[in-house]
């Protein structure tokens, strides 16, 4: 089984919904459960100041392979940084040799990807995300879905103050 994590999707969902950070270690543990995982990939965006380097290093220590790309800044200041196509390509490649892929994102753009993998490879596609920010149609397309909002204490980092 493989786990593919859209860091930006999860990070911004947790921040917007709860003002908290995600405990990615607990997310990985819940995704894997009792199964043997072959690969866990976290997809992130590097900013100009490189503030996230320590975070990416921590993810690697937790068992993730971290793939990064630079934040694009367009004329006029518009910023763009997403991994949708990269995640889709990796998911299709991996689905040929895995029995389960867990997609950690609530982005409805992944619906065609989920349907394609299910219909062509027989690989199960499961999902994890915060229910309030997850596309309902994505949830329906997945073989199984874990709503991280149902166990916030486990999946969010609360300060000790």
Regions found by a protein language model. Give the residues of each.
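Terminal and domain-boundary accessory regions
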Residues: 1-161
């Amino acid at each position: 089984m493989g786990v593919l994590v859209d860091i930006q999707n999860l990070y911004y969902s947790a921040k917007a919904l709860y003002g908290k950070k995600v405990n990615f270690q607990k997310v990985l543990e819940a995704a894997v459960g009792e199964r043997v995982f072959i690969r866990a990939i976290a997809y992130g965006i590097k900013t100009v100041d490189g503030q996230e380097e320590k975070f990416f290093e921590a993810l690697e220590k937790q068992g993730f392979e971290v793939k990064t790309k630079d934040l694009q800044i367009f004329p006029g200041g518009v910023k763009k940084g997403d991994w949708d196509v990269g995640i889709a390509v990796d998911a299709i490649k991996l689905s040929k040799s895995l029995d389960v892929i867990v997609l950690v994102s609530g982005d409805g753009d992944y619906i065609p990807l989920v349907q394609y993998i299910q219909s062509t490879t027989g690989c199960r596609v499961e999902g994890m995300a915060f229910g309030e920010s997850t596309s309902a149609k994505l949830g329906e397309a997945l073989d199984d879905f874990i709503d991280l909002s149902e166990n916030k204490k486990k999946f969010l980092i609360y300060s000790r103050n």
